[in-house]
Structure formats: structure tokens, C-alpha cells
């Protein structure tokens, strides 16, 4: 689906929402497409979202629901966003905007693309380099505008291995996901371990 949209290697893609499986599907899909995940905190106000979208120069964003869509629509015209993909359509039945699509429809575009471009997905995934930027994690912006920390696949892997060396997990461990996926620590303990 990301390749069908036209995501280029190392292109930034914004993700906005509470922790849920779709966040992870998008996050890992973006990385497999050699893109860069730019998480946005679900508590962000429209002006903060606008700043992050413009700073990241994202053309594509995924978001959770009507609440987040309302915030994005308030600033969408002031960003480079071409397509907004909504995971949860509840409350949006009958909603129509050419810039907005729903997650299921977006995935169907990917199925069609994979059928007409055999091997393209695997080729892109295999082209990922350790020094490629995997994520941009934005600071909270308490001392000014948020700053984007660019994290490579290699640095994430090294940090995850270092954490596991001092706190090895077991197969029967259960993890409570309490920080937003836009936060690096939640990724390190919930996603990458």
C-alpha cells in the first residue's frame, strides 16, 4: 500500500494515534518500505500537529479516528499532506474528502499493487540499510519547538540489545504498553524487544 501510494526510500510518514495494532502495522510497514516513521502524540493540538507535519515534510499520514481527523483537517491545507488514512471509521460513515481514505481501502490498494508489481515489496524491504533513518522521534518541545531526533536502524538495534543485556526478557513476560508509540522508550520495550 505504501509503495502504491508512491513512498520513496527514506521518505517521512506521519502516524498519529493511541497505541493499537494499526499503529504497529503502519510503523513496521513504513520501515519495511524503507520509509521513516514520524510519530505524533495523540494529545497534540492542531497547531502542534501542523508544526510536526511541516517539519517532517510528510505527504502521507495515518491516524486513529474522528477525533484525530478533526484536528488534522483544521490544519491540513497548511501542510504537504496528500493523503490521510484513518484506521477507525466509527462516526465517519458518509464522510467524504478526496484527501482521506480508510485503512481497509488503503490496504486493498496494496494488494492490487503487489499483484501488478511482483517482487517490488520484497525488493524494497531488502534494500533497507543499517544506517537508514528508521524513525524521527520528536521531543516534547518544553523549551521551544519540538526537535526531531533521527534514529537509524543500527542505533535502535544497538540500544535494544544493550537494554536486553541488562534486563533480559523471558518468553512468558507480559508488557504493559503505557507510553505512546511516538515515544522512543515505548518502542524499545514494546516493539523492538
Regions found by a protein language model. Name each.
Residues 1-47:
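Conserved AMP-binding/adenylate-forming
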Residues 29-35, 186-193:
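Conserved short alpha-helical elements in the N-terminal third of ANL/AMP-binding
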Residues 34, 141-142:
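Conserved G/P- and acidic residue-centered "switch" motifs that form tight phosphate/ATP-binding loops
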Residues 59, 77-87, 175-176:
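Conserved helix-loop-beta element of the AMP-binding
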Residues 66-81:
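Adenylate-forming
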Residues 101-104, 111-138, 145, 168-174:
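Conserved pre-ATP/AMP-binding loop-to-beta segment of ANL
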Residues 130, 149-170, 175-178, 188:
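Conserved structural elements of the adenylate-forming
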Amino acid at each position: 500500500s505504501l509503495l502504491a501510494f508512491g513512498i520513496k526510500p527514506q521518505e517521512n510518514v506521519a502516524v498519529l494515534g493511541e497505541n493499537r495494532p494499526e499503529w504497529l502495522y503502519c510503523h513496521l510497514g513504513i520501515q519495511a518500505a524503507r520509509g521513516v516513521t514520524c510519530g505524533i502524540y495523540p494529545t497534540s493540538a492542531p497547531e502542534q500537529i501542523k508544526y510536526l507535519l511541516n517539519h517532517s515534510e510528510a505527504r502521507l499520514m495515518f491516524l486513529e479516528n474522528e477525533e484525530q481527523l478533526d484536528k488534522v483537517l483544521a490544519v491540513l491545507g497548511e501542510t504537504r499532506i496528500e493523503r490521510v488514512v484513518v484506521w477507525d471509521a466509527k462516526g465517519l460513515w458518509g464522510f467524504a474528502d478526496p484527501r482521506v481514505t480508510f485503512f481497509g481501502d488503503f490496504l486493498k490498494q496494496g494488494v492490487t499493487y503487489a499483484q501488478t508489481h511482483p517482487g517490488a515489496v520484497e525488493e524494497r524491504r531488502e534494500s533497507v540499510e543499517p544506517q537508514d533513518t528508521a524513525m524521527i522521534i520528536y521531543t516534547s518541545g518544553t523549551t521551544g519547538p519540538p526537535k526531531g531526533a533521527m534514529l537509524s536502524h543500527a542505533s535502535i538495534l544497538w540500544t535494544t540489545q544493550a537494554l536486553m543485556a541488562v534486563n533480559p526478557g523471558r518468553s512468558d513476560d507480559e508488557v504493559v504498553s503505557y507510553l505512546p508509540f511516538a515515544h522512543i522508550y515505548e518502542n524499545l520495550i514494546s516493539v523492538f524487544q
